[in-house]
Amino acid sequence: MKILSIQSAVAHGHVGNSAAVFPLQRIGVEVLPVNTVNFSNHTGYGAWRGSLITPEDVHDVILGIEERGVLPQIDVVLSGYQGGTGIGDVIVDAVRRVKAANPTAIYACDPVMGNAKSGCFVAPEIPVLLRDRVVPVADIITPNQFELGFLTGTEPLTLEATLDSVDLARAMGPATVLVTSVERPDREPGTVEMLAVDGAGAWIVQTPHLPFKANGSGDVTAALFSAHYRATGDAAVALERTASSVFDLIELTYQSGERELQLVQAQNVYAHPRMQFSATRVR
């Protein structure tokens, strides 16, 4: 499997491509990383150095890949945080080019906008770009509850409401939706859930909630789920594998006392997930 991953990159820490590439490689995926920023560290520190890569330069790299005759081999286009509308246009164009070369390829979009605690932390034009131009061309999207609510104009607070919101999101274009960090009022205390929905049904998986949020964990989640789903075509299996790996990664990071994801130290949990969590069919 080959994945074209168009995301940010940092020297210190693990977000964007710096989070997604290594776990994908450890499960046997050939990754073509195209970076959209080159920063010293992620912006959660409040200070960073480096530069945005212009949409023109990102587009140029993709054209170079196309000129090498590689696009017919691409199985998945993956994108995450988008810093401006120009990058969004480049990603949509890349998806069009890849699908023209390989009609079986899919596009997996992590529509990064914010979360319930922090609100929206991207430029004001980005949510509209994602909703109106990017998500409609995606085959898979991986929003959290907050992002799902914005995309669909709903408040998905209960499981039933979340499923209804997912139906609205799927009507926009993407056949498969992974809702990360689902927090419904009636869930078991001390847990968090992920919900995967495709044309075959809907499944939810519950894991212990760790008192720790590591930047980049969502990027790993989107990457692993997209790869597992492309490989198996089974949303429940992809959900179980992803939940197992990501939980163990976050738990190891939490136990280490480090701020950044212990991505390398946890490498075996990607290649050999424990499969300690079972997905429950909810529809």
Provide a role label for each language-model segment.
Residues 29, 63-71, 96, 100, ...:
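Generic secondary-structure signature for well-ordered alpha-helical cores
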Residues 11, 202-216:
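Short pre-catalytic strand/loop immediately N-terminal to key active-site residues, enriched for Gly-Thr
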Residues 149-150, 212-235, 239:
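Short, small-residue alpha-helix embedded
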Residues 236-283:
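Charged C-terminal helix
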Residues 15-16, 46-47, 118-123, 152-157, ...:
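Short, solvent-exposed loop/turn segments at secondary-structure boundaries
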Residues 120-202, 231-236:
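Conserved phosphate/ATP/ADP-binding segment of small-molecule kinases
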Residues 2-116, 266-272, 278-283:
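Conserved N-terminal subdomain of the carbohydrate kinase-like
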Residues 84-85, 115-120, 181-186, 211-215:
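Short, small-residue-enriched loops and turns at beta-alpha junctions
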